[in-house]
Structures are given as structure tokens and as C-alpha cells.
Amino acid sequence: MSTVVEKSGEAKPGKVEVGVKLRGAEKVARIPVKIIPTEELPKKPDWIRVRIPVSPEVDRIKQLLRKHKLHSVCEEASCPNLGECFSGGTATFMIMGDICTRRCPFCDVGHGRPKPLDVDEPTNLAIAIADLRLKYVVITSVDRDDLRDGGAQHFADCLREIRKLSPGIQLETLVPDYRGRMDIALEITANEPPDVFNHNLETVPRLYRSSRPGSDFEWSLDLLQKFKQMVPHVPTKSGLMLGLGETDDEVIEVMQRMREHDIDMLTLGQYLQPSRNHLPVQRFVHPDTFAWFAEEGEKMGFKNVASGPLVRSSYHADQQAHGNKIG
């Protein structure tokens, strides 16, 4: 199994050119902890079974994304549910490019210096969604710490264009933490709010330094609460990955903190190591434990809890928003 150790006196890599995507070992070279590659990925338990993404609908959606120069987080983050979602004619769109300014070692999205925003992306995204005749869409993004508003205006522009071409559509946004830009980002977001506002805490506070370098647990909680205070009629949502080294007690404590910050919906899923150069899986959480977390979440007052090994923040997001049980 991989181990995480402190760095000491290592030479830093040179400056990355704009538009160059770093992945694997190159991506995590500068984070506060060092990832020692695993010799082999851990064997998944019997309860984790993923559909192979092979169908005409999968190919059709991929071709449509390429045609409009769009990205799906389903592909970029190597989501295990890609086949199921694409085969069902749905996708979670990732805006503002496919290069992230953060280096989270659990994530398979590439890191680097992103290109300038594509001013045509809101229109292209709206056209693609209209072509697919979608009723519920999740829009997410890479982190864009290079932008004055963290990309909030681009989110708003995308929502506005989508609503022009697809009246009645429901839109969920899965936003970054807008580090250092919360006030301006929330002001923009409140003027063109989504139907569901989602921001993932990802893990417990103790593991932030090793799992989410550059992010802050309390900041993320405040982002969700402040949005709720500004737009109280819009549900808020957050999620955790389990298997990074957290304890069950820590998960329960974070769930309680979420409720204290008026978060309405919760997703809990199993962390799966994307490659040898990512954080190792510390445990595979049994489905019975996921079911127990869901029961505890309902007792706490969450309007909906999606909890299961293959649950992801945008997995069956439409059903969760409509109150259906997922897990």
C-alpha cells in the first residue's frame, strides 16, 4: 500500500506552460505531502461492480462533447458510473477547461496553468444540452484560482444561456471553494442561482492537509451556509468520500457540522484510487455501514442522503433532488 510521508529538501519542478496538463506523479510533485506510488492497486471487494461503458449512447455523447469542445467530469475524473450515466443519456458537464489549478491527490483531473476562458462555452454548452433534451443537468468545474471571481460569472453565464434554450430545465451547480473570492462569487451566484447549490467537503478536517492541499474545511462550510443565507429557497448539498483514513465517528461529526450549517442534501461514496500515483485506499466501507450513515443522516434532518459505495455527488442527482432514495 502507498504511504504518505513529509517532503524534505526535494528539488521543485520548473514552471509549467499554459495549457499543459500534469497528471499522476507530475501533478502531485509540489503538494505538502509526498505520495509514494503503490506497487499495484488494491483489489476491489465483491460489492463494487461497475458497468463497462460500451454502448452507442456513450459514443454519441462523447462525440457531441467533442463537437462543442466540452468536457464531462465523468471522463476527466474517471468516474466509475460513466457507463451507466452516459448510457442513460445524461452527463455532468465540466466548464472552464480541463486543467485545474489545485493538486488534490485523490482526484484524476489534470493540473496546470489553464488557458483563458472560452467565451463561446456558455452558448456551446446550452446548444449541447438542448440537443440532448435533458431535463436535469449538473454543471461543475475545475478550480480556477487564476480568475478574479474564481469563475463565478462564467457559471452564471452558462446557466443563463442554458435556460434560454431549455426552459423549465433544472440546473445543479457543483462549485469550487472560491478561495479568497467568496463574497464576489456568492454575489454573482445569487443573481443567477442554480436549482441546487453543491460544494463538496470531500473528507474530514484531519485529512485536509494530505487530501485537499490549498483548501480549508471551515471555509467550505461557510461557503455553503452563506449561500443558503443569501438564497434560502435553493437547496444546498455536499458530499464526502470514504476510505481516505477517516473514522466512522469523524464522518458522523462532519455530518452534524453540515446540518449546523443548513446543508440540505448529502452524498457519501467510496473513494477509489485512480492510479498508482494517487492517495491509497485505506479501507473499503461495507454497504451496511453506508446504510447506517444514511439512517443517521435522516435522523439529523437531511432532506435526502445518497449513501453507497458507488455514489458520487452528481450520480442520479435528479432523483436525489426529487427526494428519491439512492444508495
Swiss-Prot record:
Cofactor names: [4Fe-4S] cluster
Domain of life: Bacteria
Keywords: 4Fe-4S, Cytoplasm, Iron, Iron-sulfur, Metal-binding, S-adenosyl-L-methionine, Transferase
Compartments in which it is found: Cytoplasm
Domain Radical SAM core per the UniProt entry, residue ranges: 86-303
The EC number(s) this enzyme carries: 2.8.1.8
SUPFAM superfamilies noted in UniProt: Radical SAM enzymes
Pfam families the record matches: LIAS_N (PF16881), Radical_SAM (PF04055)
Keyword hit for Flavoprotein: no
Pathway field: Protein modification; protein lipoylation via endogenous pathway; protein N(6)-(lipoyl)lysine from octanoyl-[acyl-carrier-protein]: step 2/2
Predominant localisation class: cytoplasm
GO MF annotation: an example: metal ion binding
CC annotations in GO: cytoplasm
Reaction(s) the record says it catalyses: [[Fe-S] cluster scaffold protein carrying a second [4Fe-4S](2+) cluster] + N(6)-octanoyl-L-lysyl-[protein] + 2 oxidized [2Fe-2S]-[ferredoxin] + 2 S-adenosyl-L-methionine + 4 H(+) = [[Fe-S] cluster scaffold protein] + N(6)-[(R)-dihydrolipoyl]-L-lysyl-[protein] + 4 Fe(3+) + 2 hydrogen sulfide + 2 5'-deoxyadenosine + 2 L-methionine + 2 reduced [2Fe-2S]-[ferredoxin]
PANTHER family in the record: LIPOYL SYNTHASE, LIPOYL SYNTHASE, MITOCHONDRIAL
Stated family: Belongs to the radical SAM superfamily. Lipoyl synthase family.
Protein name, per record: Lipoyl synthase
Organism of provenance: Pseudomonas aeruginosa (strain ATCC 15692 / DSM 22644 / CIP 104116 / JCM 14847 / LMG 12228 / 1C / PRS 101 / PAO1)
